[in-house]
Amino acid sequence: MVIRPSFRERSWLPALAAFVLPLAQALAAPTPPLPPPLEQPKPKPAQVSSSEGMPPLPYPVVPMKRQEKKNPPQPPVLLTKIRSADAGDWTRTPNDVKSLLEWISQQMNVHFSSNIKPFAGISADPAQNPILYRSGYKSFDLTRKEITLLREYVANGGTIVFNSLVGHPDAYQSALQAARSILPEQSLYRLRMDHPVFHSFYEIDKVSFRDRLVKDGLATDPHPWLEGVDIDNRTAIFVSRWDFSLGWEANQHESWGYADADARRLGANIVSYVTAMRDAGRSVGKSVELVNADKKSAGKFRVGQVMHDGPWKTRTAAFPMLLNQFHVATGTPVSFDLRDVSLDDAAIFEMPFLFLTGTTDFTFTEKQRANLRQFLKNGGVLFAEAAEGRQSFDSAFRAEMARVFPDRNLAALPANHAIFQQPGKLGEVKARAALAARSNNRIEMAPELYGIDLNGSLAVIYSPHDLSAGWERAIAPYAQGYEAADATALGLNVLYYAVTH
């Protein structure tokens, strides 16, 4: 006889499974390495009397004043290591930051210093502590006061690096939660290999791991595992899944971490990236507040910004700045308030123009593709740009357009296309330094746009190069795009084409 559970019994089975399965997976997972032992404090020097410490001088000799050699000035502080309340957590690798900076000094001939502070001693001004580094192996929670401080700090241009000591999952999960709590409105995502942090000084692709990580079968991905949260395309928070610190101080204690050489190279690249981006938080767009003269949206050109499963909210001031220039140049009434819309939402059919941007790959659902297809067939226009000129976004966008319109090509627009003619004629544009470096150091080039034509007009307009940094007049050393004047001119032509067609 088969005994079947009653309905009442079956009702709690999913809840039981939801509890038991993760527990079973956790028990089956390899045990993380133990942290290195705490260093024993050095004994205090033996006490000696003053008579023992100074030999008698023969009279009548007068002691000469010793000329002390002045110490060289202290290099500026770059890294501040966070001192938590649990000394058994954060002090396990006491020389990690110091060792990294000494190694960077030898490799790059740049000199920085470090210090140690509790969160209470941190300044919200990044000039006082440019990079905050928190390392430990235990789980932790940020207080509300600490979250408020760190949110202000990263908004001002500061950078936080969370390291999982010995790769411990408790510290890693706590770091992810901390990053989300500091910037809950931004995406937390794994950095793709086209992120500039992997190319800022050393070209990093595949990395080597410590023996324990390999032995436990966790080194399945040969690429570095860093996650981040961005503010206006600047990664302000880094979370490392695998341990840096033991590699920085060449400590051979076993860990789930990077081999010494790659740990140092990754640390050097983070330092290089942060110093290059130190002024990236400043832009003309952030100093200008664009306010609608009236709250009515009727009769105004309205734009919806497409949300997706990648980092989609990039330079928040950029498109309103472009709309303002468009209003000034053409007199077209515009609404500066971009409406965040999902392609699942019927609200997309209430507006004529959608803007899509991002820095990594993304995917649409079948419903989202169907809605976008119908929106475009109804006469709407989709304008997209690869923020920072990132290859991962470019590949994803092309793949999604092929799924939306499998029978049509996203084709390069010829130089004589109407979109390059009005309101300004665009024959050549100037590339930013990052794009020029990728283009055999060519500074002047033809503007590059791609499109999908429906019924004689462009329904999809796409730039594989960054435009929004130019619209915002941003300091963006890694943006592979056009200079501000040309990026704005090209954006104006796109808007003009959309309105007139």
What are these regions, as identified by a protein language model?
Residues 14-25:
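Bacterial N-terminal signal peptides
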Residues 11, 131-172, 353-394:
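Short alpha-beta junction capping motif
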Residues 110-120, 162-166, 186-194, 280-286, ...:
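Surface-exposed patches in mature extracellular/periplasmic domains of secreted proteins
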Residues 94-101, 147, 151, 172-176, ...:
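Extracytoplasmic/secreted envelope proteins and their assembly/folding machinery
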Residues 75, 170-250, 257-268, 299-302, ...:
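An acidic, glycine-rich "communication" segment
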Residues 1-9:
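N-terminal secretory signal peptides that target proteins for export/translocation
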Residues 80-81, 130-134, 159-163, 188-190, ...:
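Structural recognition of the beta-strand scaffold that forms the well-ordered cores
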Residues 30-131, 135-138, 244-245, 253-353, ...:
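Aromatic-Pro/Gly-enriched surface loop or interdomain linker
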